[in-house]
């Protein structure tokens, strides 16, 4: 689980927390009006005519076919991604988010077999989510519209997941409303924000989820998107009033479906206290995979990743098979 890690970061990517301390971090206090705006946003997103369009087949990979896909999200934003359909029977659906770098292709193989899967690109991000007026680099994207709750870009990114789910269900109606969600880093945090309000999702896996416990994150230097937010907050401390409404740990306390979280003890990009705050806040059935490192690529992390994928497959298969 833990191992000595040599590094040259100008800060300690454990932030002084061991596993016991990480498991004791609660979610921050929620704003009194946290729930209603999310519920209203979800209602609006579910009313969107997503008008999904499937392009030509782009690849054939180990028993699955890959197609380009486009759909409309909240506020008329047209987004792209990939639709992956397995050969043979299809009995479940997956929505798979991405990290803050966006994505250039779907992540294959799929986490579970027999799953029709949509890989959406969030608004503003590479390569099929670019939107005029929204920066596509991480440092500026995470600050876009941060001055107000209704204008913050993460609000739209959450709606993009809901609309992607609608698109998938329209394209493959046989799977019914029994979806799984998988997301890492940015996708883990956005997933945590999306899951409490949408009963079409029945199980989820979140790896090193971002946006957890903003009051703590704002005290911790990092190499990820949180650093831009931390520096912005130093000059504009009032932004905490917006960030409290986009706290993945606060949202996680409202999730009731089974969720597996993979959280790291050492992570220079997403501070581990925020990751564990998301897991600790979960009230439904939950499973924890403790990673030695997050956002680190070395020989040990490659092996650890294979162990994680096996755990993810077992968890999702078990819980999606119940529906």
Q: Could you tell me what each predicted segment is?
A:
Residues 254-256, 261-263:
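Short beta-strand/loop motif that positions the catalytic acidic residue
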Residues 1-63:
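N-terminal targeting or regulatory segments adjacent to alpha/beta-hydrolase or S9 domains
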Residues 142-185:
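Gly/Ser-rich "nucleophile elbow"/oxyanion-hole loop immediately N-terminal to the catalytic nucleophile
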Residues 105, 116-159, 218:
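Cap/lid segment of the alpha/beta-hydrolase catalytic domain
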Residues 81-85, 90-101:
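Short beta-strand element of the alpha/beta-hydrolase
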Residues 191-236, 290:
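Hydrolase active-site cap/lid region
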Residues 3, 276-323:
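C-terminal catalytic histidine-bearing segment of alpha/beta-hydrolase fold enzymes
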Residues 265-270:
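Acidic catalytic loop of the alpha/beta-hydrolase fold
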């Amino acid at each position: 689980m833990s191992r000595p890690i040599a590094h040259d970061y100008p800060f300690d990517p454990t932030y002084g927390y061991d596993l016991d301390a990480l498991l004791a971090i609660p979610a921050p206090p929620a704003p009194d009006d946290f729930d209603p705006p999310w519920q209203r946003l979800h209602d609006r997103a579910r009313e969107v005519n997503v008008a999904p369009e499937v392009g030509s087949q782009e690849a054939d990979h180990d028993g699955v076919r890959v197609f380009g896909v486009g759909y409309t999200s909240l506020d008329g934003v047209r987004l792209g991604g990939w639709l992956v359909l397995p050969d043979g029977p299809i009995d479940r659906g997956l929505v798979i988010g991405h990290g803050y770098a966006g994505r250039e292709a779907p992540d294959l193989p799929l986490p579970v077999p027999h799953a029709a899967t949509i890989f959406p690109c969030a608004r503003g991000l590479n390569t099929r989510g670019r939107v005029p007026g929204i920066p596509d680099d991480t440092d500026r994207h995470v600050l876009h519209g941060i001055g107000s709750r209704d204008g913050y870009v993460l609000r739209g990114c959450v709606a993009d997941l809901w609309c992607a789910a609608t698109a998938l269900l329209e394209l493959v109606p046989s799977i019914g409303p029994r979806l799984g969600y998988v997301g890492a880093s940015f996708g883990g945090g956005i997933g945590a924000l999306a899951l409490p309000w949408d009963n079409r999702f029945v199980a989820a896996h979140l790896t090193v989820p971002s946006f957890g416990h903003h009051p703590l994150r704002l005290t911790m230097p990092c190499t990820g998107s949180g650093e831009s937010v931390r520096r912005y907050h130093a000059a504009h401390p009032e932004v905490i009033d917006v960030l409290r409404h986009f706290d993945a740990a606060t949202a996680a306390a409202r999730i009731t479906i089974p969720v597996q979280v993979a959280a790291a003890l050492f992570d220079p990009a997403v501070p581990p206290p925020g990751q564990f705050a998301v897991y600790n806040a979960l009230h439904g059935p939950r499973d924890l995979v403790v990673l030695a490192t997050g956002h680190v690529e070395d020989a040990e992390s490659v092996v650890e990743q294979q162990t994680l994928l096996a755990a993810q497959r077992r968890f999702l298969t078990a819980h999606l098979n119940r529906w």
